[in-house]
């Protein structure tokens, strides 16, 4: 039995996901990073899963918060589907030990990279849908993953993204706005990894990383907010 076959047949993994695949090759595809194969990888499943996740979360929020306006519902959805939230879901599902990566990607810490983990969660969502053809079943599975986070989310301004919150924090105190600068880009488009430096008056430079400049800037802003709010 190969390592990948063991992962796919591991009842603990399937139990954490909450679904038994009829076509286990779909799960294997959902766990396979582009570094292993340019053709056989999770990217198409991720594309499908991203749309399905957005719809499932939007539908949940629409019914759970009947009196909230479109703006707040949009911010709540963004909070629940962003990379950071998906990274937490991946940690709950213990996906890092199950990723199928190239040796180089593994050595560089790819199995702990939040962007890869988030992409994998979306790919698994796409795989479950293709395997089951059952949107209601998929909805139940995804919302079960999200239960710890749905129980605590509130339609408040704190649901704004870190860059918006940091800007408002500084504006309220009449301080200069943050300056963001890309200091490193690895890989080729559209599969690049960005490192951004954020400078806020009175603080040391803080770095953030992500699969896009926007994600990297958000990560840096989140770290600065942690320092400012201590």
Swiss-Prot record:
The keyword tRNA processing applies. GO terms for molecular function: metal ion binding; ribonuclease III activity; rRNA binding. Its cofactor is Mg(2+). PROSITE patterns: DS_RBD, RNASE_3_1, RNASE_3_2. It comes from the Bacteria. Keywords: Cytoplasm, Endonuclease, Hydrolase, Magnesium, Metal-binding, mRNA processing, Nuclease, RNA-binding, rRNA processing, rRNA-binding, tRNA processing. GO terms for cellular component: cytoplasm. Pfam families: dsrm, Ribonucleas_3_3. Residues 161-230 form the DRBM domain. GO terms for biological process: mRNA processing; rRNA processing; tRNA processing. Mg(2+) binds at residues 46, 119, 122. Belongs to the ribonuclease III family. PANTHER family: DICER-RELATED, ENDORIBONUCLEASE DICER. This is Ribonuclease 3. The gene is rnc.
């Amino acid at each position: 039995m190969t390592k990948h076959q063991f992962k796919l047949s591991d009842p603990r993994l399937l139990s954490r996901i909450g679904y038994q695949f009829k076509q286990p090759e779909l799960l294997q595809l959902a766990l396979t990073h582009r570094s292993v194969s340019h053709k056989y990888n999770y990217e198409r499943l991720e594309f499908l899963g991203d749309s399905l996740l957005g719809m499932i979360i939007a539908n949940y929020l629409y019914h759970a918060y009947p009196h909230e306006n479109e703006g707040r519902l949009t911010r709540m959805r963004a909070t629940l589907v962003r990379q950071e939230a998906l990274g937490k879901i991946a940690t709950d599902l213990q996906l890092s030990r199950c990723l199928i990566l190239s040796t180089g990607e593994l050595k560089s810490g790819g199995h702990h990279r939040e962007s890869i983990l988030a992409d994998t969660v979306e790919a698994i969502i796409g795989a479950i849908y293709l395997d089951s053809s059952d949107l209601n079943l998929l909805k139940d599975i995804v919302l079960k993953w999200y239960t710890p986070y749905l129980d605590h989310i509130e339609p408040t301004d704190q649901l704004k993204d870190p860059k918006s919150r940091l800007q408002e924090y500084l504006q309220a105190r009449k301080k200069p706005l943050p300056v963001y600068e890309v200091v490193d880009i690895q890989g080729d488009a559209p599969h690049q990894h960005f490192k951004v430096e954020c400078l806020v008056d009175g603080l040391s430079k803080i770095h953030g990383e992500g699969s896009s400049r926007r994600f990297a800037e958000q990560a840096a802003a989140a770290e600065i907010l942690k320092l400012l709010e201590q």
